[in-house]
Curated annotation (Swiss-Prot):
Disulfide bonds: C439-C469, C445-C465, C454-C486
Top-level taxon in the UniProt lineage: Eukaryota
Protein name: Solute carrier organic anion transporter family member 1A5
PANTHER family assigned to the protein according to its UniProt record, in alphabetical order: ORGANIC ANION TRANSPORTER (PTHR11388), SOLUTE CARRIER ORGANIC ANION TRANSPORTER FAMILY MEMBER-RELATED (PTHR11388:SF148)
Main subcellular localisation: membrane
Lineage, top ranks: Eukaryota, Metazoa, Chordata, Craniata, Vertebrata
Length: 670
């Protein structure tokens, strides 16, 4: 009876330890890490406004994840394979959860968010200091009150978000290299593309949930529950609006910690997929083999590091692949990181709307593409070389197709004194002294305050005072300004809070942009798996983990870290009007020159992607001349495994172990 129970327990452990169970757990880890990453990316504009920081610092915060990843990627990739890989992945998930929790802390440590406005929440008909008034003395200089300046120092709490993102990057370090190498070591070579496709497709669940979560949180005011939202004079489409970004980070922290649990129950090694264990081997033999293997690993844990690095450095396909990846990832990070900001400024949408559109339109085709290419490569046994040729052609086609984005654009917001004159004539450049005009010089208005109103003539103004408005009716977001001397229209010369919305033709262009994005996302996902398989097969099996880690190291140090920083700095140069803090320091940008923004957003990534096809072309040439090391090793491994399986089937009969499928298949593989 005891032997039967032991056999049942052993069978249960072996079933739990199969590669597909690990694939499921790793997919959950991919979901949790991509959930955290995509949510972070969707909340960048909210963080920028919360802490009143420029886009370059936002890029630094976003790139700090790569800094954390960079600190350990080489060590984890090499030494991690000689340790317990599943447990290291589990520890990484826990660290990611702690990093997400730290990122939410500033909300609880700092005071309420105070947005820049000329209107008091308690403004009424008798309190009209924000309107146009003649012979009034207004202080055009910012306050120098030390108490106010100390209060603004709380904006430095963005450093908590920076450090939390670094910790999140440290936690994610072991997941990809150790997870992929674990699957590659114990899965059939023909199943690897399918499994990686499942991983990448499953990973898309995280971004979908993350973007939905981001859209939900962006609609909720940051201080919900502690302020009366009826008193707010801004809406989610306003560039001063800050959503409840901190809620999502708490959710991400919990999800990451939960997904860590299964990895602590996986063994260090698994039997090769498709082969059965020799269960007749005694437990003493197993323990002796494990002891000898552990001693051998401890002796060689460092001696192979430098030879492996030299071998990888002398691998031309591998080095060209790193160069291609660096250029492609630079372009991808630049476009994806600031895509929400671009759509907000280009098409006049709120963060909540933009994030939802990205999730609905871009992620499903990516998921379908990952699964489709993995299935096709397995079903039709497409070699890595053929897949690489196909990926190159499709990627080049998608790149040429992306140039249509240059024709799908909208004009600047029509803001008097910034992008147009008060007569509605567009300015080629922003000229600060044009903020004041004959219609508002008598009003003694603050010229550096951003509290826009939309006139019934279709023009926006930086404030009700600069629009020459002398009267207000209503409260909160329903406030209406009347008798506005700068608004020349056939109506009553009135204005409402907020920028004027862009026309219906701009909404149509947004639809075309999204259609192009769907096509581009689908083609991108189809080309991603073959490219990754080339990476796995162009290096020797014993160098695989280090090769993956070195590839990740180079893409992070030359793309992941600098790309959002320099791209954010370039975007800052297109800003037309900066918010003003109480001590006179510039805050977050309120409005951009969308024409310059569009050129930077589209031209720079196009140049980077275009240059990446030159090393990619050389990779195809080299692949025609040489056999990839991974393919050679894979064939030899399968040959040895098939011979061993046949021998065991002939000599042993252990609990009905199935035999080789047929002799013809064996001869074919031999």
């Amino acid at each position: 009876m005891g032997e039967t129970e032991k056999r049942i327990a052993t069978h249960g452990v072996r079933c739990f330890s199969k590669i597909k169970m690990f694939l499921l757990a790793l997919t959950c880890a991919y979901v949790s890490k991509s959930l955290s990453g995509i949510y972070m990316n969707s909340m960048l504009t909210q963080i920028e406004r919360q802490f009143d920081i420029p886009t370059s610092i936002v890029g630094l915060i976003n790139g700090s994840f790569e800094i954390g990843n960079l600190l350990l990627i080489i060590l984890v990739s090499y030494f991690g394979t000689k340790l317990h890989r599943p447990i290291m992945i589990g520890i990484g998930c826990v660290i990611m959860g702690l990093g997400c929790f730290l990122m939410s802390l500033p909300h609880f440590l700092m005071g309420r968010y105070e947005y820049e406005t000329t209107i008091s929440p308690t403004s009424n008909l008798s309190s009209n200091s924000f309107l146009c008034m003649e012979n009034r003395t207004q202080t055009l200089k910012p306050t120098q009150d030390p108490a106010e300046c100390v209060k603004e120092m709380k904006s430095l709490m963005w450093i908590y978000v920076l450090v939390g993102n670094i910790i999140r990057g440290i936690g994610e370090t072991p997941i990809m290299p150790l997870g992929i190498s674990y699957i590659e070591d114990f899965a059939k070579s023909e199943n690897s593309p399918l499994y990686i496709g499942i991983l990448e497709s499953g990973k898309m669940i995280g971004p979908i949930v993350g973007l939905l979560l981001g859209s939900f949180c962006a609609r909720i005011y940051v201080d919900t529950g502690s302020v009366n939202t009826d008193d707010l004079t801004i809406t989610p489409t306003d560039t001063r609006w800050v959503g409840a970004w901190w809620i999502g980070f708490l959710v991400c922290a919990g999800v990451n910690i939960l997904t860590s649990i299964p990895f602590f129950f996986f063994p260090k090694t698994l039997p090769k997929e498709g082969l059965q264990d020799n269960v007749a081997r005694t437990e003493n033999d197993k323990e002796e083999k494990h002891r000898e293997k552990a001693k051998e690993e401890n002796r060689g844990i460092t001696k192979d590091f430098l030879p492996f690095m030299k071998s990888l450095s002398c691998n031309p396909i591998y080095m060209l692949l790193i160069l291609t990846s660096v250029l492609q990832i630079n372009a991808f990070i630049n476009m994806f990181t600031f895509l929400p900001k671009y759509l907000e400024q280009q098409y006049g949408k709120s963060t909540s709307e933009v994030v939802l559109l990205i999730g609905v339109c871009n992620l499903p085709p990516i998921c379908i593409g990952y699964l489709l290419i993995g299935f096709i490569m397995k079903k039709f046994r497409i070699t890595v070389k053929k897949a690489a040729y196909m990926a190159f052609c499709l990627s080049l086609f998608e790149y040429l197709l992306s140039y249509f984005h240059f024709m799908i654009s909208c004009d600047n917001f029509q803001v008097a004194g910034l992008t147009t004159s008060y007569e509605g004539v567009q300015h080629p450049l922003y000229v600060e002294n044009k903020v004041l005009a004959d219609c508002n010089t008598r009003c003694s208005c603050l010229t550096n305050t951003w509290d826009p109103v939309c006139g019934d003539n279709g023009l926006s103004y930086m404030s009700a005072c600069l629009a020459g408005c002398e009267k207000s009716v209503g409260m909160g977001t329903h406030m209406v300004f009347q008798n506005c001397s700068c608004i020349q229209s056939s109506g009553n010369s009135s204005a409402v809070l907020g920028l004027c919305k862009k026309g219906p033709e701009c909404a149509n262009k947004l639809q075309y942009f999204l259609i192009m994005s769907v096509i581009g996302s689908f083609i991108y996902s189809i080309t991603a798996i073959p490219g990754y398989m080339v990476l796995l097969r162009c290096i020797k099996s014993e160098e695989k983990s280090l090769g993956i880690g070195l590839h990740a190291f180079c893409t992070r140090i030359f793309a992941g870290i600098p790309a959002p920083i320099y791209f954010g700095a370039l975007i800052d140069r297109t800003c037309l009007h900066w918010g003003t803090l109480k001590c006179g320091e510039p805050g977050a940008c309120r409005i951009y020159n969308i024409n310059n923004f569009r050129r930077i957003y589209l031209v720079l990534p196009a140049a980077l992607r275009g240059s990446s096809y030159l090393p990619a072309f050389f990779i195809l040439i080299l692949m025609r001349k040489f056999q990839l090391p991974g393919e050679m090793y894979s064939s030899e491994t399968e040959l040895a495994d098939m011979k061993q399986t046949v021998k065991k089937s002939e000599c042993t009969d252990v609990h009905g172990i199935p035999k080789v499928e047929n002799d013809g298949e064996l001869k074919t593989k031999l």
